[in-house]
Amino acid sequence: MLFRSEEQGVYNSGLYAQNNISVNAGMYSFPLMMPTDGFVSRGFDAERKHFGVDIAGKTGSAVLAAADGNVVFAGWTYDDGYLMIISHQQGYVTAYKHNQALLKTTGTNIKRGDVIALLGNTGKTSSGPHLHFELWKDGVVLNPDSYLLTTQ
C-alpha cells in the first residue's frame, strides 16, 4: 500500500476572502479546486476512519484534477473500485475513488482542472454515485475541507 493510515487530520477554521471564495488556512500552502460538481454527502471523520470527503453527483460527471501532478496509480481495487492517485508538489497526494471510468493512465502528467475520470459507483465500499476524495501529505491523511477552494 502506498500510504499508512493515521487517525489524525488537520482541522482549520474557515476564513472568507473577497469574491465569495471560501478560504481555509490550508489553502495558503496547497490550494485545491473542487474535483467535481455535486454536494458533500459525507465529511472527513478520522475517528470513524473516513479519510476523505464524499461528493455526491450524477454518474458520468467529470472528475477533475484538484492540482497539477503526476498519476502514480490508475486502476481497479476491490474496495475502492476505479481509483486514481495523483502525486503533487511538496509531498501532497490526492486520491479519487469509486469512478465509473478512468481517463488518464499511470505516469501521465496532468494539470489542475484536467478531466481525469468519470464519477461513478464502483467498489465494495461505495453506497451510491459519488466521488470519495482524499488528501495526504508525506503519508499522513489531511482533511481536504481545509484546502478546497469552494464558491459560496
Predicted regions, residues:
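Surface-exposed, glycine-biased beta-strand/turn segments
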Residues: 3-80
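Residue-level recognition of beta-strand microenvironments
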Residues: 43, 74-75, 99-102, 119-122, ...
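Solvent-exposed coil/turn segments that connect beta secondary-structure elements
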Residues: 45-47, 58-60, 68, 76-77, ...
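Short, acidic/hydrophobic/Gly-rich beta-strand patch recurrent on exposed beta strands
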Residues: 53-56, 83-88, 132-134
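Conserved beta-strand positions that form and line the central face of beta-propeller blades
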Residues: 54, 85, 95, 118, ...
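Short, surface-exposed secondary-structure edge patches
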Residues: 60-63, 101-102, 106-108
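Zn2+-dependent peptidoglycan hydrolase active-site motif and core
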Residues: 66-103, 129
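Conserved, short, structured surface segments that act as functional micro-motifs
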Residues: 106-152
